[in-house]
Amino acid sequence: MDKMAYKFIKWFEELRKDDVPLVGGKGANLGEMTNAGIPVPPGFCVTAEAYKYFVENVKVSKEDVKKILGEKANKGTIAEVLASAPDEPRTLQEWIMDIINRTNVDDSKQLQENTAIIRELIESLEMPNEIADEIKQAYKELSQRFGKDEIYVAVRSSATAEDLPEASFAGQQETYLDVLGADDVIDKVKKCWASLWTARATFYRAKQGFDHSKVYLSAVVQKMVNSEKSGVMFTANPVTNNRNEIMINASWGLGEAVVSGAVTPDEYIVEKGTWKIKEKVIAKKEVMVIRNPETGKGTVQVKVAEYLGPEWVEKQVLTDEQIIEVAKMGQKIEEHYGWPQDIEWAYDKDDGKLYIVQSRPITTLKETTTEEVEEVEEAEVILKGLGASPGIGAGRVVVIFDASEIDKVKEGDVLVTTMTNPDMVPAMKRASAIITDEGGRTSHAAIVSRELGIPAVVGTKEATKKLKTGDYVTVDGTRGLVYKGIVKSLVEKKKKEEAAAAPGAAVAAAPLVTGTLVKVNVSMPEVAERAAATGADGVGLLRAEHMILSIGQHPVKFIKEGKEDELVERLAEGIEKVAAAFYPRPVWYRTLDAPTNEFREMPGGEDEPEERNPMLGWRGIRRGLDQPELLRAEFKAIKKVVEKGYNNIGVMLPLVSHPEQIRKAKEIAREVGLEPHKDVAWGIMIEVPAAAIIIEDLIKEGIDFVSFGTNDLTQYTLAIDRDNERVAKLYDETHPAVLKLIKHVIKVCKKYGVETSICGQAGSDPKMARILVRLGIDSISANPDAVQLIRQVVAQEERKLMLEAARKKLLEEEEEEEDLF
């Protein structure tokens, strides 16, 4: 079998960077660098088509599944899947998607269990001979290049979504080092395929909006570098965003120790052009990863002091000449790609040469630099480490040691652990800051922290010993300091720091231009400046609830006690703060929409009715019209702000289901001197299916805009209480019925020139954003931390639409030309 006869194999020499759909980001980049003359160890890729062939052609019966899983088949999601599955065999892909579609990715336990079952199925099923035979032949050819029957190789997974700009999937799938023999290679390729379904990879795809059924996996098989020293380099400083600096991390043995964060590596900063070594931090390198001496293959972690000698622990890994050699190689690779790179490198102890084993674009680079945070004299520094992700975070400490404990970390906690491995991503998203004992600034965990915009300090050596769950700390992710307690002066600077460091800051400095506006949801006036700093095109939802309920008393009772003026003043102050922060960008204020159970818990709420399902009860515009004193106070507050010159405010009525509700609300507004359509824009929420169905009648009553409240619209359309765990798995904002309602409303609104938007949770979901752009929505309102991501997704989808339109036009023109002849 010669190379040209391969169906599922591609050699590096045959690949370029555009081959991501075929061999994934890792494989495509290795091919690109090979052809650019970069010293890359030779190898081949088992293409994504092989994985696709495997899952779409291997048939599995119910009995096969039960036999593979044993007792596990009788409980949880898989038991439900088996109960509803047809008797005839199904493809592996059908089994996988059935399990995934029933999985709530935010339920850590369920996610871990279900993805483990998928991996077990993949690893237990036999690889088709058509693929296995090609792998054996290619491995034989690669070995013969070096005059051997078998050589050591690294088998790395390469996902087809791995290095897309908006999704830092780095390290989400597995790598197997020092693999020897064709059978072992085949086994590791299957393990790579299975690693597409780790909990962390599945969680990432879900949160980044990737369709699970369309992400495939290639496996890279590459000659192993017998590393004496290795590491990672960033050709732009990932902490300060300085593109004139190269950051190099280095340690002994294989690079796995640096990437995983098992060791705190040496760190060198090199200035581009002058090649001056600006900074050297020589770390205590306690451990290293080597080829397992007992089995002759695979890897093992050993202590540096025992394997190399005590003097090697604090010895500089790279000579100054090698530091510059590595830096220059990084610059060469960056120049080739035209963008800063995240590169894994190694020196081979057999020939002493430098090799590049991987390169990918830095996906977390921002256009702005973080403002320095001054050290606070009166605060007590209790830990020092490496600032891995800039910003200030403060909160209650939760110490965990492995992924089984991640549910202990609640929203706003400070996550403390030995090293934050990728399995902890769900907890990292909830944390206000992250502190680790080990790891460097180029470890995978540090990269993910920067991507999530969460302050992180790594390599403190003793965080898990010094801190205990329940302590309170303040974390400075820029300087690498951890302070005892909540340091007020730093926390007060947090808003400014976050505005500089958050993903949205880059957008504010150099916004992507999109036809679809990207707005932001605001719950509290206190965060208005931070929300405005995201570069959002306005506020698609300003919630009234926090401002009104923060008075600490039932608002109707408050008014009856003669305090209406005080309520109006408080409301006006909050609305003005947001209107000013965004002026002249529009701010849509949604009138009060708190359910009765929230009112009942307040002082003075004793007379609130007991409702079995408050979400279907006395709330929104229904209550506003029944208790017009509430609506009147809100409109008076808006009028005060308008009279100060803020003409960027819109009024949005929640839970509208009849034209009469719009008419009556306008009458109340006019009673206080607020003129709809003149003083303020006037709009409604589309949350009730009835509103979507009679949208034309509602428009004729006079509205300027509508906004989809997808949380309620989905619940009401599907008759699902998403807080009921028995049916929550059926909750789906992309259900065809929900999308049909949205599509209908957008179509009718376009006919009448009414602006359309969305402000539900779905507005922060990339998958939903792509759908909405294609449906022609005018704007999408996202949560502050999702604005940049949604803007990137919108820009990408709009480019696709333009490209599709251009291609269609070109085809039509070609057909017209053919008709002429």
Swiss-Prot record:
Q: Which cofactor does it need?
A: Mg(2+)
Which EC numbers characterise this protein's activity in its record?
2.7.9.2
Q: Which GO MF terms does the UniProt record name?
A: ATP binding; metal ion binding; pyruvate, water dikinase activity
Q: In which residues is substrate bound?
A: R543, R590, E687, G709, T710, N711, D712
The cross-references to PROSITE patterns, in alphabetical order and at most eight, read: PEP_ENZYMES_2, PEP_ENZYMES_PHOS_SITE
Q: What does the entry list as the binding residues for Mg(2+)?
A: E687, D712
Record's keyword annotation contains Kinase: yes
So which domain of life are we looking at?
Archaea
Name a biological process GO annotation: gluconeogenesis
Q: Which InterPro entries match?
A: ATP_grasp_subdomain_1 (IPR013815), PEP-util_enz_mobile_dom (IPR008279), PEP_synth (IPR006319), PEP_util_AS (IPR018274), PEP_util_C (IPR000121), PEP_util_CS (IPR023151), Phosphohistidine_dom_sf (IPR036637), PPDK_AMP/ATP-bd (IPR002192)
Active site, per annotation = H444 (tele-phosphohistidine intermediate), C759 (proton donor)
Question: What are the UniProt keywords, alphabetically?
Answer: ATP-binding, Kinase, Magnesium, Metal-binding, Nucleotide-binding, Transferase
What does the record give as the function of this protein? Answer: Catalyzes the phosphorylation of pyruvate to phosphoenolpyruvate.
NCBIfam families in the record, alphabetically? PEP_synth, PRK06464.1
Under the heading PANTHER family, the entry gives: PHOSPHOENOLPYRUVATE SYNTHASE (PTHR43030:SF1)
Q: What is known of its domains?
A: The N-terminal domain contains the ATP/Pi binding site, the central domain the pyrophosphate/phosphate carrier histidine, and the C-terminal domain the pyruvate binding site.
Instruction: Describe the family membership recorded for this protein in Swiss-Prot or TrEMBL.
Output: Belongs to the PEP-utilizing enzyme family.
Q: What is this protein called?
A: Probable phosphoenolpyruvate synthase
Q: Which organism is it from?
A: Pyrococcus horikoshii (strain ATCC 700860 / DSM 12428 / JCM 9974 / NBRC 100139 / OT-3)
**What are the leading ranks of the lineage?**
Archaea, Methanobacteriati, Methanobacteriota, Thermococci, Thermococcales
Q: Please state the gene responsible for encoding this protein.
A: ppsA
